[in-house]
Amino acid sequence: MPNRDMLFSVPIANLGDWTFDERVADVFPDMIQRSVPGYSNIISMIGMLAERFARSNSLVYDLGCSLGAATLSMRRNIHVPDCKIIAVDNSPAMVKRCRGHIDAFRSETPVEVIEADILNIDIKNASMVVLNFTLQFLEPSQRQVLIERIYQGLNPGGVLVLSEKFNFADKDVGELLFNMHLDFKRANGYSELEISQKRSMLENVMLTDSVETHKARLADAGFEHSEIWFQCFNFGSLLAVKAEEKA
């Protein structure tokens, strides 16, 4: 059983901004299951996408890998030879635990876990790239740059999987889905204090975009095909496919 997230169950005088530190890493599996609707579905389906898109003699990237859930899902479903997964996170606590999770399972598909800023990673020869609830933590000015670098590093026919929390131009819809997400967290045992304190810590470091903004950014980078393939309330995932080279 994962350690239960009780980090915000008592009042904290000086909340500060959110960091993925040792305390968060220790309860992260429980936290994300109870906080992100559809998370386990997205993880399992990322594995299905890897089975379809991963190619031999190519690289697969998990950028912002946290504890390696998406990496493990992909590795279980990659059945082609000479395909390597590169998992990257800038949190030492996350990377340490991720390496332990990866090493606990045997596989023919090698995984390299790197502690680094994903903006400094050279993306090349990629058949698949995953940004699973990662882009929203980057400075908005850096997001287009990263998406363009991913596009350039993808091989023709390669896929980017982009999972995010969304905001909405339609304020009525946005408010409804926001409140449904609050109900989801309450149903999973979070108190009003826990919800409020976590939101206060995240509000300066997690800046969300609309689906339309994501699609425009993908198109500007060169992706000809992009669409939402999963959504639950104000959380979801898009895929963007780099066009095959024309004969």
Curated annotation (Swiss-Prot):
Enzyme Commission number, as recorded: 2.1.3.-
Reaction catalysed by this enzyme: prephenate + S-adenosyl-L-methionine = carboxy-S-adenosyl-L-methionine + 3-phenylpyruvate + H2O
InterPro entries in the record: CmoA (IPR005271), Methyltransf_25 (IPR041698), SAM-dependent_MTases_sf (IPR029063)
Record keywords, A-Z: S-adenosyl-L-methionine, Transferase
Tagged with keyword Nucleotide-binding: no
SUPFAM superfamilies according to UniProt: S-adenosyl-L-methionine-dependent methyltransferases
Record bears the keyword Transferase: yes
Molecular functions per Gene Ontology: carboxyl- or carbamoyltransferase activity; S-adenosyl-L-methionine binding
Residues annotated to bind S-adenosyl-L-methionine: 39, 64-66, 89-90, 117-118, 132, 199
GO biological process: tRNA wobble uridine modification
Subunit structure: Homodimer.
Name of the protein this chain belongs to: Carboxy-S-adenosyl-L-methionine synthase
Organism the protein comes from: Pectobacterium atrosepticum (strain SCRI 1043 / ATCC BAA-672)
Lineage per the UniProt record: Bacteria, Pseudomonadati, Pseudomonadota, Gammaproteobacteria, Enterobacterales
